[in-house]
């Protein structure tokens, strides 16, 4: 039987090499944008050197360590950066680089402004606008979904222009920055993502198996979730990238339980645990706010995958029972 993926997605060679546990890298995955080498526990490596005299984490040293990695990886400086431990009072208004860490040094949230090249932001924004002109929905997906189904399935949007543009053009380029980001802030997330079904990467052209497209304009504000919520289906922190053109006082992401507003702008990236912290997006009164959310549901590892659309996958699932 010819699957949906075979009909619509070009086969891509994905090579994965598993290293012996205890060596410098326990797994390496080769992607079109280069290899990703990961050390388990890398994100909390050298924690002993980040302790203060009382045995607690030295926030200044931890911040310097994170900024050093980000500066080297992204080849840019992040000025006026701040750091908070997760159980401390978070910054109320975030406009510069910001990290929230656990007491073992692992990153709960990372905000890095102006990570994407301006030309890339403008190119994607222009194309998204062209695509949205012919769409009625303000959301869309690429990759896999599971939602309330007992299996993972190929999102129907992959047969449409938006889904194809995401998977074939956007995701391969954004994945380059995702790899950089996760290398700096969460090797644990990389380890989890590369442990998933190889077919997910071939389908979505990204470390994350799923991508959500969210369009927000003053005229279409009614479609979205307007109450603070958690992304309870997620298993890893998500990586969010922003496009469009909107005022820097609007469209912020608010982590309501922490009284923290992150004033994101086009070109920025935000990494955080949406399944742990309640959040909501503020209104905009002008312009256009586009958010791309790269995520992984719990079901991506625990549920079967039939490499087909929801309807056809349901039929296969019933036949296997």
Curated annotation (Swiss-Prot):
Changing residue 297 to N: Strongly reduced enzyme activity with DNA containing 5-methylcytosine. Transmembrane segments: none annotated. It comes from the Eukaryota. 2-oxoglutarate binds at residues 214, 224, 242, 289. Fe cation binds at residues 229, 231, 279. Binds 1 Fe(2+) ion per subunit. Its EC number is 1.14.11.80. Residues 198-298 form the Fe2OG dioxygenase domain. It catalyses: a 5-methyl-2'-deoxycytidine in DNA + 2-oxoglutarate + O2 = a 5-hydroxymethyl-2'-deoxycytidine in DNA + succinate + CO2; a 5-hydroxymethyl-2'-deoxycytidine in DNA + 2-oxoglutarate + O2 = a 5-formyl-2'-deoxycytidine in DNA + succinate + CO2 + H2O; a 5-formyl-2'-deoxycytidine in DNA + 2-oxoglutarate + O2 = a 5-carboxyl-2'-deoxycytidine in DNA + succinate + CO2 + H(+). The record marks 148 as: Interaction with DNA. Keywords: Dioxygenase, DNA-binding, Iron, Metal-binding, Oxidoreductase. GO terms for molecular function: 5-methylcytosine dioxygenase activity; double-stranded methylated DNA binding; iron ion binding. Its cofactor is Fe(2+). Changing residue 212 to F/I/L: Strongly reduced enzyme activity. Has good structural similarity to 2-oxoglutarate-dependent dioxygenases of the TET and the alkB families, in spite of very low overall sequence similarity. Dioxygenase that catalyzes the conversion of the modified genomic base 5-methylcytosine (5mC) into 5-hydroxymethylcytosine (5hmC), and thereby plays a role in active DNA demethylation. Also mediates subsequent conversion of 5hmC into 5-formylcytosine (5fC), and conversion of 5fC to 5-carboxylcytosine (5caC). This is Tet-like dioxygenase 1. It comes from Naegleria gruberi (Amoeba).
């Amino acid at each position: 039987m010819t699957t949906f993926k075979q009909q619509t997605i070009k086969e891509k060679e994905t090579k994965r090499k598993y290293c012996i546990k205890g060596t410098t890298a326990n797994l390496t995955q080769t992607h079109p944008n280069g290899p990703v080498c990961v050390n388990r526990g890398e994100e909390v490596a050298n924690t002993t050197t980040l302790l203060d005299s009382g045995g607690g984490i030295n926030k200044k040293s931890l911040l310097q360590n994170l900024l050093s990695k980000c500066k080297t990886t992204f080849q840019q400086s992040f000025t006026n950066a701040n750091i908070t431990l997760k159980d401390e009072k978070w910054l109320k208004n975030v406009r510069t680089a910001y990290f929230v860490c656990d007491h073992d040094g692992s990153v709960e949230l990372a905000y890095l402004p102006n990570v994407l090249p301006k030309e890339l932001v403008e190119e994607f924004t222009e194309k998204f606008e062209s695509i949205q002109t012919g769409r009625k929905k303000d959301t869309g997906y690429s990759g896999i979904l599971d939602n309330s189904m007992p299996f993972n399935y190929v999102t129907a949007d992959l047969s449409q222009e938006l889904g194809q543009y995401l998977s074939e053009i956007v995701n391969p380029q954004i994945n380059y920055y995702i790899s950089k980001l996760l290398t700096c802030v969460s090797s644990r997330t990389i380890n989890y993502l590369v442990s998933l079904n190889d077919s997910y990467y071939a389908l979505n052209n990204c470390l994350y198996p799923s991508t959500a497209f969210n369009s927000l304009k003053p005229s279409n504000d009614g479609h979205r979730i307007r109450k603070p919520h958690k992304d309870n289906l997620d298993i890893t922190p998500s990586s969010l990238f922003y496009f469009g053109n909107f005022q820097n006082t609007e469209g912020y992401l608010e982590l309501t339980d922490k009284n923290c507003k992150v004033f994101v702008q086009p070109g920025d990236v935000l990494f955080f645990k949406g399944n742990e912290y309640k959040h909501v997006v503020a209104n905009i009164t002008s312009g256009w706010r586009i958010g791309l959310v790269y995520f992984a549901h719990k079901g991506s590892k625990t549920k079967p995958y039939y490499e087909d659309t929801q309807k056809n996958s349901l039929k296969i699932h019933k036949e296997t029972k």
